[in-house]
Curated annotation (Swiss-Prot):
The gene is atpB. It is a multi-pass membrane protein. This is ATP synthase subunit a. It comes from the Bacteria. It is found in: Cell inner membrane. F-type ATPases have 2 components, CF(1) - the catalytic core - and CF(0) - the membrane proton channel. CF(1) has five subunits: alpha(3), beta(3), gamma(1), delta(1), epsilon(1). CF(0) has three main subunits: a(1), b(2) and c(9-12). The alpha and beta chains form an alternating ring which encloses part of the gamma chain. CF(1) is attached to CF(0) by a central stalk formed by the gamma and epsilon chains, while a peripheral stalk is formed by the delta and b chains. Belongs to the ATPase A chain family. InterPro entries: ATP_synth_F0_asu, ATP_synth_F0_asu_AS, ATP_synth_F0_asu_bact/mt, F0_ATP_A_sf. Keywords: ATP synthesis, Cell inner membrane, Cell membrane, CF(0), Hydrogen ion transport, Ion transport, Membrane, Transmembrane, Transmembrane helix, Transport. Key component of the proton channel; it plays a direct role in the translocation of protons across the membrane. GO terms for cellular component: plasma membrane; proton-transporting ATP synthase complex.
Length: 242
């Protein structure tokens, strides 16, 4: 089996639509729904208090995640950005759940597909743009022309800044998808190699796979962290401005 077979999108339910549209329910959609449910269940479990007053593992985990999100927003967008904690927290939990679920046996990594990560990135960047105009009006356009820019350099600076702004969702999407694809592919290749080895020689590569899986879990958390931090950095343009 090809190492890339794990990323194949499979139709689970055909939904006929006119004009050649295809909105069939796929394994990718199924695991995105599962990731959303896992995030919701984790939050619900964290809100429940134990009778003895002690904190559960889910409560501790969510508290750590919440503190990270608050810290990231305060560091990049300032106190004014704290009203958007639910949005940023939802982004982090969804990306993290998608990444982790993809590592599990029979799992599917929705964030390995650029279509999914690009949709997430467009939502983030579009939201930032709308919030920017909502908070600052037309003054939001100042992000394309830094204060003190010489007049002769202004057209080039506006072009560069506009290009960089429009490239944000693409760079966010490709970074996340590429890292998910790379890690899962390496594990699949080595796992297939181990299966073909003599049983006497298999334990060492098998142990190496376990190390790679642990590293992949770290990468899954790291990529969710990076995606969230960049979201708060972009949010700072809307809330704080330049």
């Amino acid at each position: 089996m090809s190492p890339l077979e794990q990323f194949k999108v499979v139709r689970l339910l055909e939904i006929p639509m006119p004009f050649g549209m295809d909105i069939s329910f796929t394994n990718c959609a199924l695991f995105m729904i599962l990731a959303s449910l896992v995030s919701a269940v984790l939050l619900c479990c964290a809100l429940r208090k134990r009778t003895d007053g002690s904190s559960s593992m889910s409560h501790t985990a969510v508290e750590l995640i919440y503190n990270f999100v608050v810290g990231a927003i305060e560091s990049n967008a300032g106190v004014g950005g704290l009203r958007y904690i639910p949005f940023v927290l939802s982004i982090f939990l969804f990306v993290l759940a998608c990444n982790i679920i993809g590592i599990l046996p029979l799992g599917f990594t929705a964030t390995s597909h650029v279509s999914v990560t690009l949709a997430l990135s467009v939502v983030v960047c579009a939201s930032v743009t709308v919030l920017g105009f909502n908070h600052q009006g037309l003054h939001f356009l100042r992000i394309f022309l830094p204060e003190g820019t010489p007049l002769w350099l202004a057209p080039m600076m506006v072009f560069i800044k506009l290009f960089a702004y429009l490239a944000r969702p693409v760079s966010l999407a490709i970074r996340l998808a590429a890292n998910m694809i790379a890690g899962h592919t390496i594990i699949a290749v080595i796992a297939e190699f181990v299966l073909k080895m003599h049983p006497v020689l298999a334990p060492l590569p098998f142990a190496f796979i376990m190390v790679l899986i642990a590293f992949e879990i770290f990468v899954a958390i790291l990529q969710a962290y990076i995606f969230t931090v960049l979201t708060t950095v972009y949010l700072s343009d809307a809330v704080a401005g330049h």
